[in-house]
Amino acid sequence: MNLAEICDNAKKGREYALLGNYDSSMVYYQGVMQQIQRHCQSVRDPAIKGKWQQVRQELLEEYEQVKSIVSTLESFKIDKPPDFPVSCQDEPFRDPAVWPPPVPAEHRAPPQIRRPNREVRPLRKEMAGVGARGPVGRAHPISKSEKPSTSRDKDYRARGRDDKGRKNMQDGASDGEMPKFDGAGYDKDLVEALERDIVSRNPSIHWDDIADLEEAKKLLREAVVLPMWMPDFFKGIRRPWKGVLMVGPPGTGKTMLAKAVATECGTTFFNVSSSTLTSKYRGESEKLVRLLFEMARFYAPTTIFIDEIDSICSRRGTSDEHEASRRVKSELLIQMDGVGGALENDDPSKMVMVLAATNFPWDIDEALRRRLEKRIYIPLPTAKGRAELLKINLREVELDPDIQLEDIAEKIEGYSGADITNVCRDASLMAMRRRINGLSPEEIRALSKEELQMPVTKGDFELALKKIAKSVSAADLEKYEKWMVEFGSA
């Protein structure tokens, strides 16, 4: 007799009982008790035989408990006579593996749309522009004989009244309230996600917060800001640019420039990335692109900033391109052309400007490159720009009187704006690191604020420069300059 098999069967019986599989558990309990009984017949030692009998008795008690649980569960399944007779027609047989048919909904008119109510008249007047195409709502209850309208009909009617409904909402909105986007025809969750995660009104970034980049600021003012200030001038051949592409190494301030543009223009700022316009459901990504541009037109004047646009609209026709990615690119290109077409017949002050930034301009699709008419280069900061950036980053930090920011600016040549910010942050922490060196956690907590507010010295910057190297190589800069010579449009 294999003792390991007895132990394994007893273990499985207990595990099945714990998992609720009582039928299998009872089978294993019965088998292991028979095995123990046969094993006891072959044992000659009375002491060992008594122990096996004790084990069999314990397993028998467990078996009786499982059997009691099964009988209790079976008692719940006993059919009790109903209080009232039920015919076979009332309760037809239902296959548990098949979903039951939906319960028919009773269509009733909401109580707030009754004729005596005078408060809903402004809403009905607001929708009067849609009444020429057909009835949108019903004032009387829908009878059961009438066929309810399908979701496809509602979608067509909603899309047909999108532009008029939104224009009426903009005209009827009070001065103190921000008009709300009417997402009729779209999933409510998609609209709320874009409103919550993308829309950023009046970012508090100004031109003075950005060091250097005077040429880029001048070009952005001409391409984006001036059409807002002089709408009568920018008409016809002087129409505003459809899009602006900012090209440059990482950390040079492209996102900061986009936020400054939105602040100076007083526009609604949409910050879009590849995750924003991506959905696992077929066709949802294209709807998100279209919804984004419709919301941008509604909240116009609007700045749509697409960061890392090469991840959304890379070159088409490659072997590793997916069908869904191609559809998203096509919808984005169509909507960008649609923005320009809408501006020609609309108020120039209601423009939608597309700002894009990329670190890989050579991967962008040719059609998108054509739509982004202004392509400007955001270079590394100059010596003057590095000194200004040091002043901006260290304006809240106490500096040693002997420190010369111009000397430090010469040492960080080739550093990007993000690299310089990291150097300033690391240097400002050096004094704190020296102060808490060797102290226990209790002593660190007991330190006063004045003890930690020590000035930053030149030696702190030297230590920080030894630890932090520049992140942009000369070969990368040469690639950007070569691309700008071939495709730049500054």
UniProtKB/Swiss-Prot annotation:
Composition-biased stretches (Low complexity): 128-139
E.C. numbers: 5.6.1.1
GO cellular component terms given for this protein: centrosome; cytoplasm; cytosol; katanin complex; microtubule; microtubule cytoskeleton; mitochondrion; mitotic spindle
Residues recorded with modification N-acetylmethionine: 1
Cellular compartments annotated: Cytoplasm, Cytoskeleton; Cytoplasm; Cytoplasm, Cytoskeleton, Spindle pole; Cytoplasm, Cytoskeleton, Spindle
Enzyme class: isomerase
UniProt feature, compositional bias: Basic and acidic residues: 116-127, 143-169
Molecular function per GO: ATP binding; ATP hydrolysis activity; identical protein binding; microtubule binding; microtubule severing ATPase activity
Residues noted as binding ATP in the record, renumbered to the chain: 248-255
Catalytic activity of the protein: n ATP + n H2O + a microtubule = n ADP + n phosphate + (n+1) alpha/beta tubulin heterodimers
Function: Regulates microtubule dynamics in Sertoli cells, a process that is essential for spermiogenesis and male fertility. Severs microtubules in an ATP-dependent manner, promoting rapid reorganization of cellular microtubule arrays. Has microtubule-severing activity in vitro.
Database matches in HAMAP family: Katanin_p60_A1, Katanin_p60_AL1
Family: Belongs to the AAA ATPase family. Katanin p60 subunit A1 subfamily. A-like 1 sub-subfamily.
Oligomeric form and interacting partners: Interacts with KATNB1 and KATNBL1.
Protein name: Katanin p60 ATPase-containing subunit A-like 1
Biological classification of the source: Eukaryota, Metazoa, Chordata, Craniata, Vertebrata
Gene assigned in the entry: KATNAL1
